[in-house]
Amino acid sequence: MKKGTQVSEKIPAANRQYKDTVFRMLFSEKENLISLYNAVTGNAYQNADDLKIVTLENAIYMGMKNDLAFMLETNIYLYEHQSTLNPNIPLRDLIYIGIEYQQYVDDKSLYSSRLQKIPAPKFMVFYNGTDAVDDRVELRLSNAYEQLAGEPDLELKVLMLNVNEGHNKELMEQCQTLKEYAIYVARVRKYTSEMNLNDAVARAIDECIKEGILVEFLRKNRSEVKMVSILEYDKEWEEKKLRKAEYEAGKEDGKSEGIEIGRDKTLAEIICNMIKSGFTIKKIAEVT
């Protein structure tokens, strides 16, 4: 968000259930989530109530954020949205699934002679950043091992799907909500090159509603979608700056003078903290 941006909409007082990405807002709705699951797996579940949401909301503040975690039959699925490439996702998912399993067996004894059954995990990332990425990429935990001889004793695989407009077309056709989400993101990116971020997001929302794209969702959640979109884009921009700074720091052969990464809070972090404290968008605009 740029200084001087004028915003007047209000959002509900935020709480620990606050959704920090449009993707998470959309697919936290069970009907949308079951549609996404069916598209990814080729299944045809009709009853969204078969899903049990097990996302660890407090894990966001522990640095172990995962957008969506749910159980279906005997499996547990971890879905995450990413707008920047992150090779550490398998390690993060390993820690996250450990917390999930700890909660799952909390009231059961792991020292008994009876085998404790647990849901089989499936890990997936939905990527819509600006870096060129294949439609499907497999990330492996073993890639992080400093030295590895032979097959790893511990492996974790994450399937990353490129969900930018024009990618994974068959998947998009199977999940209309995902397809329309990709269109919305593309509109925001297009207009940010032509106008300030606040106006770009507003225009993208207006156009999508007029063209029948995510109509019900955008009308119902307009103010929150607008703020979250601004936060997302600002975060994406800050992460790009961070990577550039890290690259430049590396070119200086380890010299630390003049470069301090991660010391100051970004504007997005400040806004996010204000939202969690219950500030309205109008008040946030006044102080930022």
Regions found by a protein language model. Name each.
Residues 1-288:
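Elongated, amphipathic alpha-helical interaction scaffolds
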